[in-house]
Structure formats: structure tokens, C-alpha cells
């Protein structure tokens, strides 16, 4: 079983207490609690939990608003906790980057799979984003090399092959 650091955000103190107890029984560490969306976002940024467990309806910023900000910055996996399971709410949760969805009252046997799946999806998304950034850098480098090769070819009236050879020789001699 995986153990996660979890941020709990719910405006109901009794629900937060029950969730903390349940999570700790399951071997997780509750690293912070918030009673509104603004504090949930702020705590997620500072504490960097594995998972943020957010209620939908909270003051100052909803759980969906906090989820969107947390997801946009790739801070942690977000699991939404709500009493609502209607299609529009699920659509909003999906748009906000929520990776799992639990309907209140949360049952013990549902929470562990939701946390594990959300964390796995978060790791996958982070890896894909990292790969995309590396590919983007590679494309930019290839474009820069292509343009430099073109400049060499025009200035020295040489073939593409000769321009490539000179660039490679220069890179080797300068230790690149």
C-alpha cells in the first residue's frame, strides 16, 4: 500500500477531523488542513503534498477553483470531495484538472483507490509534460542548427554536408 502526504480542505471541521482520522488509519500523513479554497491553494503551494483532497463547496474560493490553480501549476494530485455527483459537476471537475472524485459520505474502501489512482495519473501527467518540454527544446535546438547551417552554406558557398561537418568539428573542438 502507498502512503501519501495529504492536504485536506473542507469548510466543515467535523468532516476534516473524520478525514484526518481515516487517512491516518490508512497510513497516510495529513500535512495540512484548510477550511477554504484560498488557504487550500496557499497550503498546497507551500507544503507540496502528494495529494490534495478538496471539498467542492467552500468559502473564499471553491474547491474547483483551488483544484484548477493547483492542477495548472502541477503542484500535486487533486481529489475532489463532494456531495454532488451530477454530470455538470463532474464536467467542471474534469476541466479543473481533478484526477479522482469521491462522493460524500466517503467510505473507507473508496479512499485508498482514489488516492492511488490520482497519484499515478499525476505522475504520468508530470512525466508527459517533462517529455514535451524536452522535445520542445530539441525542436528549438534543431531549428537553430538548421538556420546556422544555412548561414554557413550561404557565406562560404559550401554544401549542406560540408556545413554540417564544420559545425560538428567546431562543437568537438569547443567541447560541446
Task: Say what each PLM segment does.
Residues 13-32:
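Two-component/phosphorelay signaling modules centered on CheY-like receiver
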Residues 36-39, 60-65:
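Acidic catalytic/metal-coordinating carboxylates
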Residues 49, 58:
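Receiver (REC) domain active-site loop signature in two-component systems and cognate sites
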Residues 55, 82:
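Active-site residues of response regulator receiver
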Residues 88, 106-115:
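C-terminal output helix
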Residues 94-96, 111-123:
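Receiver (REC) domain switch/output surface
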Residues 123-124, 130-176:
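C-terminal output/effector regions of signal-responsive regulators
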Amino acid at each position: 500500500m502507498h502512503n501519501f502526504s495529504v492536504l485536506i480542505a473542507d469548510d466543515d471541521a467535523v468532516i476534516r477531523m473524520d478525514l484526518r482520522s481515516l487517512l491516518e488509519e490508512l497510513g497516510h500523513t495529513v500535512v495540512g488542513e484548510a477550511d477554504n479554497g484560498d488557504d487550500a491553494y496557499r497550503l498546497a503551494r507551500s507544503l507540496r503534498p502528494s495529494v490534495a483532497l478538496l471539498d467542492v463547496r467552500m468559502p473564499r474560493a471553491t474547491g474547483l477553483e483551488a483544484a484548477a490553480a493547483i492542477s495548472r501549476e502541477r503542484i500535486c494530485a487533486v481529489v475532489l470531495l463532494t456531495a454532488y455527483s451530477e454530470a455538470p459537476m463532474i464536467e467542471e471537475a474534469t476541466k479543473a484538472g481533478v484526477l479522482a472524485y469521491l462522493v460524500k459520505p466517503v467510505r473507507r474502501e473508496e479512499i485508498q483507490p482514489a488516492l492511488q489512482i490520482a497519484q499515478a495519473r499525476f505522475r504520468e501527467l508530470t512525466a508527459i509534460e517533462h517529455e514535451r518540454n524536452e522535445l520542445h527544446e530539441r525542436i528549438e535546438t534543431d531549428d537553430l542548427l538548421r538556420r546556422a547551417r544555412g548561414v554557413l552554406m550561404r557565406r562560404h558557398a559550401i554544401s549542406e554536408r560540408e556545413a554540417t561537418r564544420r559545425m560538428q568539428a567546431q562543437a568537438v573542438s569547443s567541447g560541446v
